[in-house]
Amino acid sequence: MRVKDYTNLFVLQSGPVSENETATNEICDYAVDAGLDIIVYFGDLQPKILLDKDLLWRLSWLSTAKQYWGDKFLGVYYYDEPGGNWLDYDRWSTLFEATSNTTYDDVAKVYTECTQYDEGYQQLEDNSITVFTSDYVLYWFDYLMGYDVIFAHAGWDHTLEQDIALVRGAANLQNKSWGTIITWKYNHPPYLDTPENVYEQMWTSYEAGANYVIIFNYPTYPEGNQYGVMTDEHFDALESFWNDIVKNPVVHGSVKAEAVLVLPQNYGWGMRNPEDNIWAFWEPDEKSEQIWTILQQLLTQYGTHLDIVYDDPAFPVTGNYQQIYYWNQTIT
């Protein structure tokens, strides 16, 4: 394995491989033998669906994975981008019919209770398996849904500081873990950002306290590249990042949140731009412009020293931050 001397984690996130027990085990064995921890992706674990697809082996696999691989098996990457799918693709939101009387609270309740009706998620809970996923919106609500670890997307034309503020703030107040996954910058070749920018994204994430930093290495480009989309220069950047961490162990988490922006409770706004939707059912409302304005001011002022959370009595901000800003206050 090319990266075994300068990484410690392998995420097996392949739909086709996840349908092949032998391939899954062989790849996991290979990664663990190389000294890496493993996280394994499954797109579904509901028994009825697995029976129809002849994939019931996944359930017995769950019950033995921790015993077989021990501490090297970190958990299961279950589904993918639940928040993004809800806001952008109607894959989940179509399960809920909004009416003229529907409120943000109603939709938040449906979204965060999805796992209660997912027998696959219950299988993970029953086996005390840590549950991971990645997303690019609604991190706060993904954690409320029950996920233990969220990987925030980095690499798109998002503001990395904003995504860190959202995922770290949610993880901090809800006592969860977080990370980033460096994904595509382009929907076309060369897909990944430059090695220099990928290095900076990894460093910024790690410095801000990310527990996991991952590179999404897919598909194959150019043709014949046996290492996915990563170039030799990307591997050099990854090795440099690893060596910089080893030499500077105090770097992790050295950039801490000094301030927090508190958003309205259950305000499921995508926040990627001023025109983003709210819970897939509503256009921006009267609060959106005000939130966007103060958000830009605070990101400029604090950068990665800012967290973003939601007003929720179950997770008070008082005592956790030096400076607290509310969405509807004016900054002079």
Spell out what each predicted region is.
Residues M1-T332:
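Glycan-processing catalytic domains of CAZymes
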